């Protein structure tokens, strides 16, 4: 989707887009994505694209986020003909391109003289050996979610925009066991939910070959596990517990997570799946690192080489 780098922009653009092209008639365009049912903007995009492309129906294949790498890879290797696949991690598109599953986009971009400037230099993340295999779909940064209801009940001040990781850990331990608060914090099972905080100093890079900076964050998470201030990684992986399920139980005080979760949380509260006051603040930071520092996640979209509607799929990608 063109210039969709945040949830707000995604929804705003699809609601304001006018019809500018006629698409194939009576065609179903299938998109494989994760957590469609808990991500409201997918429905908004479906409705907007269908409204501007009469005769086209968008159909989603919903895959649980924790099963994405295995499920999506199995579908592609099995010859699945779904038209579009979301790209959760850069390693996805690198593998899929090398395995011949991704349709090269370079010729489509050249044919339409498609302007890539709106991606502000992010599109090379999805290129391999000079060929573009996917385009950015969404970009998000990480924040700290917190349960205001639990903090209010405990009489403890909310987390702030200028809080060190040591202060965060102390606050998590303080909140643990107070009233209905069972856990002071929550770490999801993704690698990024631990190690990516190390890049917030603007110096360390995950591509540098040295990973000493990560140890601090591993040790911090393990210390919180040992203090029973967060759910244990082994228990989370065994149960397959989604981060939204963990936070929405209402017994967790804080959770570092991407900004995309805002729309899901609002929607789930609206639908009665949870009921508490909540807020967001900047991620904690290490001593000497500027307050408000964060890191981002990029989500991409690619055309399946087995798609039978490649031109229409490109129209969706470039829309």
Residue ranges and their predicted role:
Residues 75, 82-83, 112-150, 182-184, ...:
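A structural signal for short loop-to-beta-strand junctions that line the ligand-binding cleft
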Residues 51, 57, 154, 269-319:
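Extracytoplasmic/periplasmic substrate-recognition and gating elements
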Residues 36-57:
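Short, polar/charged alpha-helical segment
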Residues 172, 206-237, 283:
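Glycine-centered hinge/linker elements that transmit conformational signals in sensory
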Residues 62-71, 88-91, 163-169, 234-248:
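Short helix-initiation/N-cap motifs at beta->coil->alpha
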Residues 1-30, 51:
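Short, low-complexity disordered leader/linker segments with a strong preference
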Residues 88-141, 275-282:
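Hinge/lid segment of periplasmic solute-binding proteins
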Residues 25-36, 56-61, 83-84, 133, ...:
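Short, well-ordered beta-strand elements
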